[in-house]
Amino acid sequence: MRAAWADGRTERAPAVVRDLVVESGARARFSVDEGAGRIRVAFDPPSPGSSWPRWDRCLTFDGKPLYRVGSLCDTCELGLTLLDWPDDEAARIAARMRGRLTDLDRLDTALLAEWSSVLGELETGHYRALLLDLPLERVAEPTRSWWYRRATARAEADGDDGDRPEYDRPDDYWPGVAHFQLTAPVPGGRVPFTYGAFMPSQPPEALAPAAVARHAAAVAAGERPAAVVLGWIDDRYVEALHEERWLVGAILDGHHRLAAYAAAGVPARVLLLARVGEGSGADGGLEGLAEVAAVYGCRE
């Protein structure tokens, strides 16, 4: 190390995508070494004197917080809160993948090798790539979101008499922005079902109607343009009473495509990139992804 400093070699080692294995046209796995981590879930800086030095986390784009994700506490419910919009970084990175996204119908080694420079922008770790056809809907009302509906389902299971406290208003569960969600939870085994929500990385009101219409026409003609989502499985045992699993992610590219799919009621083609092995979904991450892929994996 001293020799490296003496020679002035302080630059970061280049990212390497390794152990690339395509399991099927809808599933692949790979690892990233020396990843740039430009898009990642990171712990907030500790507050001076705090007894919880690494507690809250945020989804960050080039170090700028986009969504507050909350802690790793397994008995706390998952909740996302919009903080700010990134400086188009997600779109710039994902745009380098667009050539094959126009009508993506299968994953292959050549495709993922071609995208190595983009995958190297991710955080160091092990990943799964899933090509999915997901029934999504756009939700703009708090009472329609799974963020609130899962809370009411827990209350019903607990025998709540309907006299909900003030802090259980729908707005208190709302992430602060319209987003896309699964039309129904994914049925599971150990965990009964998985909720799903994909959050935008750009203001929804900035979507161009002409672009949405163009993608809608392509979908109607039988094409399946793909969106790119960086996501993960989050497992919780809320209040030590309720098993709860989420597939949650940030849309890196394809906001217009997802809007077109949702408006047409056609399952959305999604390339999901999911880091596995760490965080609150560490135990059930692979299990949850396998259940989602079994139901919604793109059929060859």
Task: Please place each PLM-identified region on the residue numbering.
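Short, low-complexity, polar/charged sequence segments that are solvent-exposed and flexible
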Residues: 249, 270-272, 289-292
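N-terminus-biased targeting/localization segments
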Residues: 1-38
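Amphipathic, charge-rich alpha-helical segments that serve as recognition/docking helices
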Residues: 277-300
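Short beta-alpha junction loops
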Residues: 233, 273-278
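Short, conserved phosphate/pyrophosphate- and ester-handling motifs at nucleotide-, phospho-/glycolipid
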Residues: 254
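Short alpha-helix boundary/capping and kink motifs at helix termini
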Residues: 30-250, 262-263, 267-269
